[in-house]
Each structure stands twice: as structure tokens, then as C-alpha cells.
């Protein structure tokens, strides 16, 4: 998957920090690919590797093209449902309003589709906040506290907050049935 994503050193660092940024949230959710988180962890690692696959594509077509590349790309180790899941994460990562097609609804459970949305919205939030850079993403954390999805940012980096970040935090919080909070 890393080869497909044409990962460079900057993207490798962002992938690692994306895992750290999302770990508390995703590990707290019940598994949707079996009885343990192991299969999901592997899929999420792949989704994080693919997080920037559409970065250079035209914004009007980015979601569809990136999804098709993930669905049909030359990589091994992913069965059809896994590819479909990764394709859905990628599509929603680039277009929040992407509606699952018959392909997704026939191959994935409603819980898996819901999880794909959660992962994609987490990637969207992280990318918006950090500009897809490891050094900036390290300065924030995501957690759940008292019914709130909390984005904590180091005080000296509060100026990195934008309306776009607030909006994406709100979308993710809504997906998780939580209120958004910034600290």
C-alpha cells in the first residue's frame, strides 16, 4: 500500500502521527471486522498510508478517482471487502458527503460503513489542522471526555485553529454522537 500511495518521508511521518492522533478514539470503539481490533488496526494503517493519495488530483474529481485507485490498485494483502472499505474511507476523506454505492452496501455491514466514515472524518480533521505534516499534528491530541470529543492543542499553537478545523471537528463529533470541544 505504501508503494501505491507513493509515500515519501513527509507522508511517512504524517501516517505515524495520524495513527497516534486517532488511536484513543478508534481503539475505544467496538471492533467491526471480527472479535478483535487486529484486522481493523491493519486496515486503518493502510488507510493512513493512503491518506494523501488524492492530494494532487483535481478537487472536483479527487474523491472518485482516489477511490477507484484504491479499489483497483496494484497491491496485495487486501481481500475485496478490505479494498472496498479502504476505497470508502478514501472517498469520504476527500468528500464528506460521499454516499456509499451498491458496491459498499453489498460488501460491508452498516457498522463497517459507519466505521469507514469515522476513520475518514478523523483523517480530514487531522489533515486540515496540520496541513498533512507530522510536526504540526504532534501538537494536538484527540480524546473523549464527559460526552465530548476534545481536540487539545498546545497553547502556543492555538493560532493554528481555523474555521475549517472547527467545522471538521464538529463533523467528526456528530458522527460519534458527541459534542465538539477545543482545549
Language model region names:
Residues 2-6, 13-142:
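Divalent metal-dependent catalytic cores for phosphoryl transfer on phosphate-bearing substrates
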Residues 74-75, 150, 169:
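Short, charged/polar low-complexity linear motifs in solvent-exposed/disordered segments
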Amino acid at each position: 500500500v505504501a508503494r501505491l500511495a507513493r509515500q515519501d518521508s513527509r507522508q511517512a511521518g504524517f501516517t505515524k502521527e495520524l495513527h497516534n492522533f486517532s488511536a484513543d478514539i478508534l481503539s475505544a470503539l467496538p471492533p467491526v471486522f471480527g472479535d478483535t481490533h487486529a484486522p481493523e488496526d491493519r486496515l486503518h494503517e493502510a488507510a493512513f498510508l493512503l491518506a494523501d493519495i488524492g492530494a494532487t488530483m483535481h478537487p472536483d474529481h479527487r474523491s472518485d478517482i482516489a477511490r477507484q485507485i484504491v479499489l483497483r490498485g496494484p497491491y496485495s494483502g487486501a481481500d475485496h471487502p478490505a479494498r472496498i472499505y479502504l476505497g470508502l474511507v478514501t472517498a469520504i476523506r476527500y468528500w464528506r458527503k460521499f454516499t456509499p454505492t451498491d458496491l459498499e452496501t453489498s460488501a460491508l455491514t452498516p457498522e463497517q460503513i459507519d466505521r469507514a466514515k469515522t476513520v475518514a472524518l478523523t483523517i480530514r480533521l487531522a489533515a486540515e489542522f496540520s496541513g498533512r505534516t507530522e510536526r504540526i499534528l504532534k501538537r494536538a491530541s484527540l480524546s473523549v471526555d464527559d460526552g465530548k470529543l476534545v481536540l487539545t492543542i498546545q497553547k502556543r499553537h492555538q493560532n493554528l485553529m481555523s474555521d475549517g478545523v472547527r467545522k471538521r471537528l464538529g463533523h467528526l463529533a456528530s458522527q460519534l454522537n458527541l459534542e465538539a470541544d477545543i482545549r
